[in-house]
Amino acid sequence: VKFQKDNGLKKTIFLIPNKNYKNEIKKAIKKSKIKTFKIHYYDTDPTKLTKQVEKITKYPQRKQNVKDEIKRLENSEDPNKEKKIKNLEKKDTIGKIGFDSLVIADFDESLKSITTSLIYTDVSPKKIYFITLNQWFDESLLKETSYQPIYYPSINKEMAGPIAYSSSI
C-alpha cells in the first residue's frame, strides 16, 4: 500500500496463474489491503498465454490505433504528415492500456513467460511498474535488462521484529 501511495499508483492489476493456489493469493491480496484495480487469472500454457496478455493489455486495439492514425494523417492536410507517419511506422502500438502497475503472482519460468508476453505486447517496465513476488534471488531475472526495472516486495525491518534463521544442514 505504501509503495502504491509513494509512486502515485491508482490502477494496479494482479496477474494470477490459474493454479490450485489462486484462492490463497486472492485471500492474501484482500488481507493486505493493497488497492486492486482488477484481477486477471491466466493459463500458464505458453500456447495460450500471449493471447491472454494481448487481451489484458488491449494489444489488438492499440496496434489498430497505429494503422488508424496513419490513415487519418494520410488523408489530412497536415504539413508535417510525412514526418508524423514515419514516426508512427516505427511504433508497434499507441494508446492506453488501462493500468499503471501490475503485480505478477508467479515464479520461475512462468514469471519469465508472462513478462516476455507483456514486453511483446508493447508494455514496458520503463512505463508501467512491474511488481513480482520475492524473486530477487533469481539472478536470471536481474540480468535480463528488458525486464528492468522490476520491483520486489520486502519486509519492514522495524515492523517485523527479530527474525530467526534455521538450517537443515
Regions found by a protein language model. Name each.
Residues V1-F107:
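Extracellular/periplasmic Venus flytrap/periplasmic-binding protein
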Residues P17-K19, F107-E109, Q135-W136, I155:
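Solvent-exposed coil/turn segments that connect beta secondary-structure elements
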Residues I34-H40, L49, E54-E82, I97-G98, ...:
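Extracellular/periplasmic periplasmic-binding protein-like sensory domains
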Residues S101-I119:
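Hydrophobic alpha-helical
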